[in-house]
Each structure stands twice: as C-alpha cells, then as structure tokens.
Amino acid sequence: MTTLLLAMTTTLALAAPTEKPAIIVEGEQPPARITRAAVLTPTEGPPVVLYSAVNQTDQQLEQFTVMAFVFKADGTPRARQVAPGRRTLEPHETKYSTIVLDAGLVDPTDIIVIGIDGIQRAGSETWWHAELRPLAEKAVPVKKH
C-alpha cells in the first residue's frame, strides 16, 4: 500500500504544470482590471493563463474581453489572442477565469502579456476600450544581442 501511495504521489508531482507570471497591462481608467495572472504549462496541451479580474466600480459590469499576447524571448511578437472574460462582475467583485493559448506554438522562454481590452457596463450598449498592443510591446523586456 505504501508503494502504491508513493507511486501515485510521484506521478502527480511529475504531472504538475509549471507556473510563471504573465505581464499585466491596462488602459487608462479601466472599470475592471486584472490583478494577477499566471501562465500554467501542463505536460500535455497548450499553456493556460489563469487570471483574476476585479470590478473597480460601484456599477455592475455586464461583460469584458481579455487579450493575450505572446512574444519571443527577444521581444518579437509571436501571437495575439482574444477571449471573453467572465460575465457579470458585481461592484468590487473579483472573479477568476482562464484563457487557453492555442493560437500557435508557445515556447517555455516566451513572454506572455495580458490585459482587459473591452468592458461593457450593465444596461449600456457602450464599451470601454483599450488599445493594448502598444502597451504590451512596451512592457516586454527586450533582450539585446
């Protein structure tokens, strides 16, 4: 029994995903923001960014979209991906969600940048929007050759 337990524990430890922080960017005066983002790389399948988003307002937010950028270690853009975030963020509420980075190959040395690019308040057709690409490019540390 002890051998079986040890084998199962070892298997779980070896199958655990690796984790590294993602760089977070945001536009001016966002109604919601990402407060933490971690890139989880499983032994099989594409990396996943686990993030927390918090509503910074006293109003309900109907929906938001998240944009993730993948840069090579030298700062060269590799991919961009957009996904819907969680629906309905109550005032000052924090929710957790994920974005699967399956738009292309992601190397372990790649740099992941994430931010909220669009937010719609409840009862409104108007969206708050941020142009994240220049912010993402500026946030990536460029390695000099």
Model-derived segments and their meaning:
Residues 1-13:
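Bacterial N-terminal signal peptides
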Residues 18-52, 130-144:
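Low-complexity, acidic Ser/Thr/Pro/Gly-rich terminal tails and inter-domain linkers that flank the onset
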Residues 19-23, 102-145:
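Terminal connector regions
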Residues 53-57:
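Asparagine-centered strand-capping/turn motif at beta-strand->loop junctions
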Residues 59-63, 78:
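Short acidic/proline- and small/hydrophobic-mixed sequence motifs that coincide with surface turns
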Residues 65-68:
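Hydrophobic beta-strand segments
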Residues 70-80:
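Short aromatic-acidic-glycine turn motif
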Residues 78-107:
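Intrinsically disordered, low-complexity Pro/Gly/Ser/Thr-rich segments with frequent PxxP/GP/PP motifs
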